[in-house]
From Swiss-Prot:
Protein name: Glutamyl-tRNA reductase
Known partners and oligomeric status: Homodimer.
PROSITE patterns per UniProt: GLUTR (PS00747)
Species: Gloeothece citriformis (strain PCC 7424)
Pfam families referenced in this protein's UniProt entry, alphabetically: GlutR_dimer, GlutR_N, Shikimate_DH
Binding residue positions for NADP(+): 189-194
Highest taxon listed in the record's lineage: Bacteria
Assigned protein family: Belongs to the glutamyl-tRNA reductase family.
Coiled coil: none
Additional observations: During catalysis, the active site Cys acts as a nucleophile attacking the alpha-carbonyl group of tRNA-bound glutamate with the formation of a thioester intermediate between enzyme and glutamate, and the concomitant release of tRNA(Glu). The thioester intermediate is finally reduced by direct hydride transfer from NADPH, to form the product GSA.
Catalytic activity: (S)-4-amino-5-oxopentanoate + tRNA(Glu) + NADP(+) = L-glutamyl-tRNA(Glu) + NADPH + H(+)
Role played: Catalyzes the NADPH-dependent reduction of glutamyl-tRNA(Glu) to glutamate 1-semialdehyde (GSA).
Active site: 50 (nucleophile)
Length: 428
């Protein structure tokens, strides 16, 4: 049995590949059930963000489990396996454990140290629990990774002043225009990324901001967070009209297909008009064919790398501090995992000793007579249980703490032989 992660990220695949494999939350239950139906996949969790798609799995046979996950991704994205493989990374056991902790700490993010990824890891764990994807191993791994992410943020300065995808998008737009303060800006979408866009635009002095969203109520909730700003709100039906009077448009929706394309833009863009589109969604909200229109400058999440680079160098030094903390968390998980091979023996020994305790207690109580037994049974029960627990406690602690695998195996074999234990192997 092994822990594996198969995935791709902004480091290994362009956005046009990542968007094909993006898994919306509404489809997650179905996808988790599908993956768990494979014969070699025992537990599974899926981390799907704009910059990565990673499938964490406990596999009963490593090679076959990897093949099953890779084949699933190929079929889901309609990408031939030989083409997809060049974009995939595959990590096993300790490398997979370390990778998730680095992800949770923001060390694998496009924006080094960004905080949003920890919330996304938490959500991955919550949904995998809700839909029955994870069991004992991945549950513990994700909890350890969340602890690692929190420690890195509280014990180092890596999260201080970190740029986000949204702030990088605003920086990019500011770099491309003469004066962003006078620009008319439209944001399509009203989620967390859009909230951050509004926040950063206001900090740059932008005052003409419109929000377009399918749910006007969500747009109103967003506007309520910025009472000092006079945000214009539009339903999705008015999207094209709002875009037509804008200088810059940011898109950040959960749409699975492009909502802006050459067809719906070319008729509304004047010959002398200039329009900038900044798409921070995956799958993309803006079709690549808009680049055929001369008046339009179009950017997506992959274009943010240059903006982020200037912020990265100072943060890399802080990341080195985080590495030591992460190794402590990796080691903690490894110790716990290695101790699992003691569980069947310890459980079996406890069951056997408990059976003996109950049998001997019953004999003793029958000899003491009914009146005495009824009056003192609870005391005698607690006494015998306490004796058993104290006798077993120290050997069990030492057995779990034994880090030498061969020495621990010899101890387990000795216990099994001396107490004639019939062990059903688990978690090997």
């Amino acid at each position: 049995m092994n822990i594996a992660v198969v995935g791709l990220s902004h480091k290994t695949a362009p956005v046009e590949v990542r968007e094909k494999l993006s898994i919306p939350e509404a489809k997650l239950e179905e996808v988790l059930a599908h993956l768990k139906s494979y014969p070699h996949i025992q537990e599974v969790a899926i981390l799907s963000t704009c910059n990565r798609l990673e499938i964490y799995a406990v596999v009963t046979e490593t090679e076959q489990g990897i093949i099953e996950i890779s084949q699933f991704l190929s079929e889901k994205g309609h990408i031939p396996l030989h083409h997809l493989r060049r974009h995939l990374f595959i990590l096993l056991h300790q490398d997979a454990v370390r990778h998730l902790m680095r992800v949770a700490a923001g060390l694998e993010s496009l924006v080094l140290g960004e905080g949003q990824i920890l919330a996304q890891v938490k959500n991955t764990h919550k949904l995998a629990q809700k839909y029955g994807g994870i069991g004992r191993l991945l549950d513990r791994l994700f909890k350890q990774a969340m602890t690692a992410g929190k420690r890195v943020r509280s014990e180092t300065s890596i999260g201080t002043g970190a740029v986000s995808i949204s702030s990088a998008a605003v920086e990019l737009a500011q770099m491309k225009v003469i004066d962003i303060c006078v620009c008319r800006v439209t944001i399509i979408g009203a989620g967390k990324m859009s909230r951050l866009l509004v926040q950063h635009l206001l900090s740059k002095g932008v005052s003409k901001i419109a929000i377009v969203n399918r749910s006007l109520r969500r747009a109103q909730e967003l506007a309520g967070l910025f009472p000092e700003a006079q945000l214009q709100l539009h339903p999705l039906e008015e999207m094209i009209n709002a875009v037509s009077v804008s200088d810059i448009v940011f898109t950040s929706t959960g749409a699975t297909e492009p909502i802006l394309n050459r067809s719906n833009l070319e008729s509304i863009i004047a010959v002398n008009q200039s329009l900038m589109l900044v798409d921070i969604s995956v799958p993309r909200n803006v079709d690549a064919d808009v680049q055929q229109l001369e008046q339009i400058q179009s950017y997506n999440v992959d274009d943010l790398k240059a903006v982020v680079a200037a912020n990265q160098e100072s943060r890399r030094r802080l990341a080195q501090e985080a590495e030591g903390l992460l190794e402590e968390e990796v080691e903690s998980f490894e110790l716990w995992w290695r101790s699992l091979d003691t569980v069947p023996t310890i459980s079996c020994l406890r069951d056997k000793v408990e059976t003996i305790r109950e049998q001997e207690l019953e004999k003793a109580l029958s000899r003491l007579g009914t009146e005495f037994a009824e009056k003192h049974q609870e005391v005698i029960e607690a006494l015998t249980r306490g004796i058993v627990n104290k006798i077993l406690h120290e050997p069990m602690v030492q057995l779990r703490a034994q880090q030498d695998i061969e020495a621990r195996k010899r101890c387990l074999q000795s216990l099994q032989m001396l107490f004639d234990l019939d062990i059903e192997e688990q978690y090997t």
